[in-house]
Amino acid sequence: MDLFDRINKLKEEGLNEIKQAENQKMLDKIRVELMGRKGELTEILHSMKDIAPENRPKVGQEVNQVRDLFQKQLDEAKNNFLQTLIAKKLEEEKIDVTLPGREGHLGSKHPINIILDDLESYFIGMGYEVVQGPEIETDHYVFEMMNLPKDHPARDMQATFYIDEENLLRTQTSGDQARVLEKHDFSKGPLKMVGPGKVYRRDDDDATHSHQFQQMEGLVIDKNVTMSDLKGTLEMIAKHVFGQDRKTRLRPSYFPFTEPSVEMDVSCFNCDGKGCPICKYTGWIEVLGAGMVHPNVLENAGVDSTVYGGFAFGLGLDRFAILKYGISDIRDFYTNDVRFLAQFRKEED
């Protein structure tokens, strides 16, 4: 068989193999066998040294024509495979535009955020400033500035997460009060602020306790602020959140940063003050603590306690939400159950 017969036979067999290829992988293998560095066309070119010089141009021309033909057929086959693949993918992933769209799920605010936003708006309307301090606080601001020096026995009331000897996760937002007191210029007017935020205590999580909860503390400092001002403010808060018919009472208590100190109760939501298991048959439920700011707290912040005085209060936003909405387990706030959260959508209006 001469070289021209070999070229023609290779052309016929090569075109047939390309035609019968079933996928791109087979096509790539055929390309290498026909046109690769060790392919059959390359071998023919290498064998041209054994033919007469006058025939070499013609053989080279034949080889190039066959190479171009192979390349054309390979490209066409590759394009066909690609089109088939695209068509298959479109068929598998097609969207029926006549189907109705999926209904969107309307979100809702978290019940604690509903309480928080409502109280912030309420206090802003009464001229209070909303202040937020750091959650990682210093012992100085959380305790010492609030009349709780080191080794004070009342520190045992606080189950604290200490980061190191000086820094801690705040157990209350009172540190915000101390920071504002230090900087406030009383020549420009009285101080009225609320400080909401997360606080942390080493409690075991159960239906009524959590190691993390949200608190809001309030502070009013001016000349001639009295206990009557505090009582009126607390009553307004209770009636705003729990309803105008809710009865309130103050009981003596103890907090290191206030003197005198009180706790406020509201009439039981379940029995309306008649007595039931929820209120332990007292007719009352505790909602917050408060008192007149201790002179030491003022002096620690550089405020003359003989000229200025005021009151402070602290309330648990989680507790307010539990009482207002009748929630039995505080853990419901943090389990992200959309069925639980959806029921508060109407409360946002």
Swiss-Prot record:
A single GO BP annotation from the record? Answer: phenylalanyl-tRNA aminoacylation
According to its UniProt record, this protein's enzyme class is ligase
The main location is cytoplasm
Q: Which GO terms describe its molecular function?
A: ATP binding; catalytic activity, acting on a protein; magnesium ion binding; phenylalanine-tRNA ligase activity; transferase activity; tRNA binding
Write out the annotated subcellular location. Answer: Cytoplasm
Q: Does the keyword Protein biosynthesis apply?
A: yes
Q: Which CDD domains does the UniProt entry name for this protein?
A: PheRS_alpha_core
Keyword set, alphabetical order: Aminoacyl-tRNA synthetase, ATP-binding, Cytoplasm, Ligase, Magnesium, Metal-binding, Nucleotide-binding, Protein biosynthesis
Record EC number: 6.1.1.20
Q: Would you tell me the Gene Ontology cellular component terms?
A: cytoplasm
Residue positions annotated to bind Mg(2+) are E259
Pfam families for this protein: Phe_tRNA-synt_N, tRNA-synt_2d
Q: Where is the signal peptide?
A: none
Classify the source by domain of life: Bacteria
Q: How is the cofactor bound?
A: Binds 2 magnesium ions per tetramer.
Q: PANTHER family attached here?
A: PHENYLALANINE--TRNA LIGASE, MITOCHONDRIAL (PTHR11538:SF41), PHENYLALANYL-TRNA SYNTHETASE (PTHR11538)
Quaternary organization: Tetramer of two alpha and two beta subunits.
- Family membership noted in the UniProt record: Belongs to the class-II aminoacyl-tRNA synthetase family. Phe-tRNA synthetase alpha subunit type 1 subfamily.
Question: Which NCBIfam families does the record cross-reference, listed alphabetically?
Answer: pheS (TIGR00468)
Task: Identify this protein by name.
Answer: Phenylalanine--tRNA ligase alpha subunit
Q: Upper lineage ranks? A: Bacteria, Bacillati, Bacillota, Bacilli, Lactobacillales
